[in-house]
UniProtKB/Swiss-Prot annotation:
Name of the molecule in the record: Ribonuclease pancreatic
Disulfide bonds: C26-C84, C40-C95, C58-C110, C65-C72
Source organism of this protein record: Rangifer tarandus
Chain's role: Endonuclease that catalyzes the cleavage of RNA on the 3' side of pyrimidine nucleotides. Acts on single-stranded and double-stranded RNA.
PANTHER family reported for this sequence: RIBONUCLEASE (PTHR11437), RIBONUCLEASE PANCREATIC (PTHR11437:SF24)
Main location: secreted
EC number of this enzyme: 4.6.1.18
Catalytic-site annotation from UniProt: H12, H119
Length: 124
């Protein structure tokens, strides 16, 4: 079974995107990372930084998660990210996404040993 850490990498990590600037980026990535398998995942964020830099966030600023848990961490610096958001015309199995690039601080939930990101909580 896929570990929570591996799932985070599959769903959220894209360190050196070949086509993040393309408006089609989300449509391609959401499909290739299996985020449209049994439904269209409505919202998803890809982080264009090294895995080491994202894992390091687990040792940065401790903040509360959206669900009230206390194991979330906010990155000290802004990171290159791409937000993918399902459009109104999207209907499974033809999932359609809007691609938005940004530079924001990320908030991730971490757990385990080694202590690594297992959930993408927000960007600010």
């Amino acid at each position: 079974k896929e570990s929570a850490a591996a799932k985070f990498e599959r769903q959220h990590m894209d360190p050196s995107p070949s086509s993040a600037s393309s408006s089609n980026y989300c449509n391609q990535m959401m499909q290739s990372r299996d985020l449209t398998q049994d439904r269209c995942k409505p919202v998803n964020t890809f982080v264009h930084e090294s895995l080491a830099d994202v894992q390091a966030v687990c040792f940065q600023k401790n903040v509360a998660c959206k669900n009230g848990q206390s194991n979330c961490y906010q990155s000290n610096s802004a990171m290159h990210i791409t937000d993918c958001r399902e459009t109104g015309s999207s209907k499974y199995p033809n999932c359609v996404y809007k691609t938005t690039q940004a530079e924001k601080h990320i908030i991730v939930a971490c757990e385990g040993n080694p202590y690594v990101p297992v959930h993408f909580d927000a960007s600010v």
